[in-house]
From Swiss-Prot:
Keyword Chloroplast: no
Statement: the UniProt record of this protein carries the keyword Acyltransferase: yes
Protein name according to UniProt: Leucyl/phenylalanyl-tRNA--protein transferase
Pfam family, one: Leu_Phe_trans
Protein's gene: aat
Function of the protein: Functions in the N-end rule pathway of protein degradation where it conjugates Leu, Phe and, less efficiently, Met from aminoacyl-tRNAs to the N-termini of proteins containing an N-terminal arginine or lysine.
Subcellular localization: Cytoplasm
GO BP of this protein: protein catabolic process
Catalysed reactions, as listed in the record: N-terminal L-lysyl-[protein] + L-leucyl-tRNA(Leu) = N-terminal L-leucyl-L-lysyl-[protein] + tRNA(Leu) + H(+); N-terminal L-arginyl-[protein] + L-leucyl-tRNA(Leu) = N-terminal L-leucyl-L-arginyl-[protein] + tRNA(Leu) + H(+); L-phenylalanyl-tRNA(Phe) + an N-terminal L-alpha-aminoacyl-[protein] = an N-terminal L-phenylalanyl-L-alpha-aminoacyl-[protein] + tRNA(Phe)
Organism: Serratia proteamaculans (strain 568)
GO terms under cellular component: cytoplasm
EC number(s) stated in the UniProt entry for this protein: 2.3.2.6
Name of the top EC class for this enzyme: transferase
Length: 241
């Protein structure tokens, strides 16, 4: 297996099955972040991840981390927190602010550089990339963004400036996405944060099969219209005797 150098004259990508095992999922190098190339990548289960100033790297890891909205997990402590309804959650109200906040996370390093921000903001303006914002009063305290592929949503990054804000973003989006027929959220690589919310790993081949099926299921345009999302509904605790 070897890393493929992308041609500047073609949007073709190599098969994800040819990706390296170490580092896991590295598939190709080069190309650009134009909208046609980014969309061609997402359609094939491939995403960019690289450091600013360095060559663009393209990835398709195996296994793949995913979250089925119907299987989302809300812990007891998070349920208690959400019952107080401390946040207002919106969709596509301020994409630029969300991706800038994701780039500003120290623990994320600096991979979401200016070039990446410009590219995804362009995708947003074209109607392919979307943001979820979490507000406390008028302050943006959390959120996430990603790229829609029919009934599959490719989550790219999230941030939180106060307790549980990013969890609230993901859980509220799960319910909204499922209500419009969304079936799967791509989390790319499993981490402790998404695992606590119900994300799990599946083989890359299974992910690619689901991607092929779900990207042919377009959701109603109303799903992505700028809007305020209803508060996450959490059942009250069962009464004790």
């Amino acid at each position: 297996m070897r890393i493929v150098k992308l041609s500047p004259h073609s949007l073709a990508f190599p098969s994800p099955e040819g990706a390296l095992r170490d580092p896991n999922g590295l598939l190709a190098i080069g190309g650009d972040l134009t909208a046609p190339r980014l969309l061609a990548a997402y359609e094939r289960g491939i995403f960019p991840w690289f450091s600013p100033g360095e060559a663009i790297l393209w990835w398709s890891p195996d296994p793949r981390a995913v979250l089925f909205p119907a299987e989302r997990h809300i812990s007891r402590s998070l349920k208690r927190f959400l019952r107080s309804n401390p946040f207002r959650v919106t969709l596509n109200h301020d994409f630029a602010a969300v991706i800038a906040a994701c780039a500003d996370r120290p623990e994320e390093g600096t991979w979401i550089g200016p070039e990446v921000q410009r590219a995804y903001l362009h995708l947003h303006r074209l109607g392919f990339a979307h943001s979820i914002e979490v507000w406390q009063g008028d302050e943006l305290v959390g959120g996430m963004y990603g790229v829609a592929q029919g009934a599959l949503f490719c989550g790219e990054s999230m941030f939180s400036r106060t307790t549980n804000a990013s969890k609230c973003a993901l859980m509220t989006f799960c319910r909204h996405f499922a209500a419009y027929g969304g079936e799967l959220i791509d989390c790319q690589v499993l981490n402790a944060h998404t695992a606590t919310l119900g994300a799990k790993e599946i083989p890359r081949r299974q992910f690619l099969q689901q991607l092929s099926q779900l990207q042919r299921k377009p959701l109603a345009p109303e799903c992505w219209a700028p809007q305020v999302l209803p508060p996450q509904q959490v059942e009250p605790p069962s009464p004790t005797n």
